[in-house]
C-alpha cells in the first residue's frame, strides 16, 4: 500500500470537481510537490490522472493551491478526449511523475523546444485499470518525445510494479516484444488525438522513435532538477502554485492546518456524479495520411 488516499470534492464531470490527495496521517498534500519522485531504488511514483478507457481529460491543477486533480476546461467547456477509431478514450492509465516539471524557460537539447510547464507525463501499460487520484509505483521502460504546438511534451512509458507481468519488462524493447502494436498505437494516438477538435496532428522528435529506459530516466532526472529550482524559488513559476507541506527547503511550505483550510473552503464531497455527455461515446473516423 502506498499510504496515500484521495478525497473528491463536488461532483465528477462538473467545473467544481476536484480530487485532493492525503498522506498516511490523513493530512492534505500536493500530488505535484509532496509525493516523492522515488518510491524505491529505480522505482518511481505515478499520480494517476486518467484511468484507461476513460475520456474526461483530468490533470493536476498546477496553478491551484495544493494542486488537486480537476477536469481541463477550454473556452468554458469541460474537455473530453475523442474516441478516434479504433481507440476508446485513453489507451493506458495516464498521469504524471510527481516532483518533476518541464520548464517552459528551458529549450530541450534533444527537441529544440521549451517544456510544456507541467509535470512529466506517464503512460502506464499494465493490465489493471487504475483509479483517478491513485498513487502507484512504476518501473520506467522508455520515453517518447512529442512536440505539442511547439512545446516539448515527453511521454514516459512505464508499468505498475504490482502488475503480474512487471518482472518481464526491463526496457522498451520488451514492450515491443510482449505487447506487439502497442507502441505504434501509442504514437498514432498522440499524433491524432486532437484532430477531432480541429487541431493539426502532433509531431515528434527522433522520427517518433521511442528511447530506452536509461534515456528516459535521464530525462526524468532533469525534470526533477527543474522542479527543485521551481519549488525553492530559484526559477519563477509564473503562476504555478508551489504550496507544499513537506519540502523543507521551500519557502512555499505550509503547515497541515493551512492546507486543510484550502480544502474546507470548497464544496463538500458529492455522492452522485453528473452524467457524461452522450457525445463522449461518439466514434471519430479519420483518413490517415
Swiss-Prot record:
Positions carrying Phosphoserine: 250
Ribosomal protein is among the record's keywords: no
Catalytic activity field: diphosphate + H2O = 2 phosphate + H(+)
Residues binding Mg(2+) 1, per UniProt: 116, 121, 153
GO biological process assignments: phosphate-containing compound metabolic process
Reported cofactor(s): Mg(2+)
Molecular function per GO: inorganic diphosphate phosphatase activity; magnesium ion binding; pyrophosphatase activity
Cellular component GO terms, alphabetical: cytoplasm
Subunit field text: Homodimer.
Protein name: Inorganic pyrophosphatase
Species per Swiss-Prot/TrEMBL record: Mus musculus (Mouse)
Amino acid at each position: 500500500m502506498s499510504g496515500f488516499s484521495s478525497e473528491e470534492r463536488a461532483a465528477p464531470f462538473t467545473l467544481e470537481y476536484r480530487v485532493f490527495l492525503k498522506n498516511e496521517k490523513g493530512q492534505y498534500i500536493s500530488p505535484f510537490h509532496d509525493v516523492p519522485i522515488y518510491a524505491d531504488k529505480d522505482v518511481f511514483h505515478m499520480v494517476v490522472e486518467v484511468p484507461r478507457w476513460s475520456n474526461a481529460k483530468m490533470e493536476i491543477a498546477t496553478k491551484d493551491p495544493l494542486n488537486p486533480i480537476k477536469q481541463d476546461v477550454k473556452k468554458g467547456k469541460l474537455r473530453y478526449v475523442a474516441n478516434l477509431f479504433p481507440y476508446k478514450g485513453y489507451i493506458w492509465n495516464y498521469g504524471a511523475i510527481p516532483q518533476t516539471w518541464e520548464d517552459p524557460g528551458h529549450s530541450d537539447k534533444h527537441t529544440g523546444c521549451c517544456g510544456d510547464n507541467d509535470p512529466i507525463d506517464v503512460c502506464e501499460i499494465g493490465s489493471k485499470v487504475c483509479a483517478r487520484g491513485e498513487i502507484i509505483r512504476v518501473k520506467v521502460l522508455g520515453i517518447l518525445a512529442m512536440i505539442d504546438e511547439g512545446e516539448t511534451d515527453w511521454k514516459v512509458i512505464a508499468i505498475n510494479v504490482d502488475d503480474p507481468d512487471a518482472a518481464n519488462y526491463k526496457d522498451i524493447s520488451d514492450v515491443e516484444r510482449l505487447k506487439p502494436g502497442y507502441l505504434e498505437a501509442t504514437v498514432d494516438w498522440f499524433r491524432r488525438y486532437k484532430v477531432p477538435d480541429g487541431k493539426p496532428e502532433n509531431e515528434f522528435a527522433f522520427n517518433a522513435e521511442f528511447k530506452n529506459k536509461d534515456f528516459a530516466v535521464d530525462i526524468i532526472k532533469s525534470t526533477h532538477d527543474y522542479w527543485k529550482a521551481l519549488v525553492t524559488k530559484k526559477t519563477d513559476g509564473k503562476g504555478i502554485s508551489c504550496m507544499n507541506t513537506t519540502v523543507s527547503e521551500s519557502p512555499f511550505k505550509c503547515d497541515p492546518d493551512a492546507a486543510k483550510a484550502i480544502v474546507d473552503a470548497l464544496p463538500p464531497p458529492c455522492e452522485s456524479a453528473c452524467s457524461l455527455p452522450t457525445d463522449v461515446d461518439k466514434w471519430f473516423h479519420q483518413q490517415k495520411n
